[in-house]
Amino acid sequence: MYGKLLICATASINVININHYIVELKQHFDEVNILFSPSSKNFINTDVLKLFCDNLYDEIKDPLLNHINIVENHEYILVLPASANTINKIANGICDNLLTTVCLTGYQKLFIFPNMNIRMWGNPFLQKNIDLLKNNDVKVYSPDMNKSFEISSGRYKNNITMPNIENVLNFVLNNEKRPLD
């Protein structure tokens, strides 16, 4: 077992599949915990997800959650799926919710898995921010492009999709981070 893992789930439509990742990752980690961005809760029932993970951090139900304690309690922090909005916030040090505050505090343990439509992915501001993250030792997965259903257009299109669970695990374990000082 590889220690404790925190999944920071953002408001990307593929967050609806996060339970599959939790179940599979639990086979490899001592604990798999989850923290949702406020907007991601519009896509998923967090009460159901409590059945899959070890702990679900909810800043609304527990406003006294401490970002430093959360970071210190985990060896790995995954932003899965990572929306363009959250990637841009992390790169620019914007801490307007518990998820982005945890990511900024624990950047040395951070792994980002982008998931968005191809137009957002190609945005030069986003690409600049991804380069900024990579240049500061944040591990950003080179995303997969697959045909997927795009909610906004109602059509199947090539988009940036979440990697399969095996690729997530391999990326994390092959790019382990140094501990925080």
UniProtKB/Swiss-Prot annotation:
The active site is at H67. Binds 1 FMN per subunit. Keywords: Flavoprotein, FMN, Lyase, Plasmid. Signal peptide: none annotated. Its cofactor is FMN. Pfam families: Flavoprotein. GO terms for cellular component: phosphopantothenoylcysteine decarboxylase complex. One of its GO terms (molecular function) is phosphopantothenoylcysteine decarboxylase activity. Its EC number is 4.1.1.-. Changing S83A: Loss of FMN binding. GO terms for biological process: coenzyme A biosynthetic process. Belongs to the HFCD (homooligomeric flavin containing Cys decarboxylase) superfamily. Homododecamer. PANTHER family: HOMO-OLIGOMERIC FLAVIN CONTAINING CYS DECARBOXYLASE FAMILY, PHOSPHOPANTOTHENOYLCYSTEINE DECARBOXYLASE. Catalyzes the removal of two reducing equivalents (oxidative decarboxylation) from the cysteine residue of the C-terminal meso-lanthionine of epidermin to form a --C==C-- double bond. This is Epidermin decarboxylase. It comes from Staphylococcus epidermidis.
